Amino acid sequence: MRKGFFFDLDGVVFNTEPLYSQFWGEVGKRLLPEIPDFAKQIKGQTLPQILDAYFSGQLAAERDDVVSLLNDFEAHMDFPYVPGFLDFIEWLDNKGADTALVTSSNQMKMAQVYRRYPDFKHLFKEILTAEDFNESKPSPDPYLKAAERFALGPEECVGFEDSFNGLKSLRAAGMKVVGLATTNPPQAIGELADYVINDYTAPEPLNRWLEKL
């Protein structure tokens, strides 16, 4: 069994993607009505990437408003766990695995998570946020930095992702990839993942697969 197990946050630990889809859908309708399915277009992108790509030029004046809206949204949103996650992370902990959260979310958002779940930090041995990376996903940098925290090589690590950018990041890092079909359908992410799950509620097949690695 491999030693390092790294997790994205939204769509992997928390089932928040539907909430963000609603938020960005409303932003798109109001500010970018010419772009259909704006929420789908920006899935897996960091806030700076979204702002640079869509809120520059004529819409540059809207940047602060978008950031303010997002901060307020995250301050009041729910953070429901992906079903079965807590049992799965406990299983890994009992195996003595090195676990890390590797998220493009910033410390401001994580402060809301810690406020909601004071023990959240204890679920992982390391937590890496946007402030820790030189480059965002799909660059391999976030996951390679996580491996460095444990002095592990990529071949010793498994990553869990839901977005295309996240899956590409793991692939580029040379790690085994578990894809979660919480954001995109299984057939859409299958080519980028070594193993695909809907959630963690039927862990036995996944656990057996991981133990063979």
Regions found by a protein language model. Give the residues of each.
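Asp-based, Mg2+/Mn2+-dependent phosphohydrolase catalytic module
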Residues: M1-K3, E90, N106-M108, Q112-L213
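Active-site neighborhood of HAD-like aspartate-dependent phosphohydrolases
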Residues: M1-K40, G57
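Conserved phosphate-coupling serine/threonine residues in phosphotransfer and NTP-handling enzymes
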Residues: V12, T103-S105
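Helix-loop "lid/cap" segments that line or gate small-molecule binding pockets
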Residues: V27, T46-Q58, V113, A147
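Short, surface-exposed acidic
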Residues: L31-Q41, G57-V67, F120-F124, P154
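Residue-level signature of the cytosolic catalytic core of signaling kinases
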Residues: K43-Q45, Y81
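Metal-dependent phosphoesterase signature
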Residues: D52-E90, K95
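Short phosphate-binding/catalytic loops that engage adenosine nucleotides
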Residues: K95-A97, M175
